[in-house]
Amino acid sequence: MNTPHQIQYEAFAAARGLYDERHAKLYAEFAEDLIADGSFSIVYEGVAHACYTPLTIDKALHLKCFVLAPLAVLPEFQRKGYATRLMEEAEKQLDADVIFVMGEPFHYGNRYNTPHKVLPPVKTQAPLECWFARELSPGALDGIGESTSSVTGPYAAPLMWGHPSEQV
């Protein structure tokens, strides 16, 4: 059985493009830090891993929210639906109202497409068009309007909210 560290490291080490071995090490260690801090961690069929960290919407303290990151699938299993099935299973287990993710539109735009005005919990140069939400409780974000949000623990580090080119 692959560990979260192994899955994160191998996936990002093989990703190329924006990522290199330094990112692989950073994200694998980040996942370990999140797990040690109590974030929800899920390994799906030994080939995919993700962490979900509690997030507070400052104008909606009653909502149970999480932010997803990091998510990785071993290279030989990518583009075969493992990430989607992992997210579906995590959503069942978390019983959340809303899940947020900061990421590329081509990865997350279809699944995380709930309109919202919740700001990321950490100041980032990333465009707000890359800050996605998925309501799991229909209407959970209705009437919230613009709001700040917050996280604690390892994901509160500004480095992890930066563009990959800024992280290493």
Stretch-by-stretch model annotation:
Residues 1-6:
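Conserved N-terminal entry element of GNAT/NAT acetyltransferase domains
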Residues 99-128:
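Conserved active-site alpha-helix within GNAT-family acetyltransferase domains
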Residues 39, 95-96:
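Short, high-confidence coil segments that cap the C-terminus of an alpha-helix
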Residues 52-53, 86, 90, 114-118:
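Short acidic (Asp/Glu) patches
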Residues 68, 73, 79-92, 101:
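Conserved acetyl-CoA-binding loop-helix of GNAT-fold acetyltransferases
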Residues 123-167:
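C-terminal "cap" of GNAT-fold acetyltransferases
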Residues 56-68, 78:
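A conserved beta-turn-beta hairpin within the catalytic core of GNAT-like acetyltransferases
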Residues 8, 12-43, 49-56:
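Active-site rim helix/loop that mediates acceptor-substrate recognition in acyltransferases
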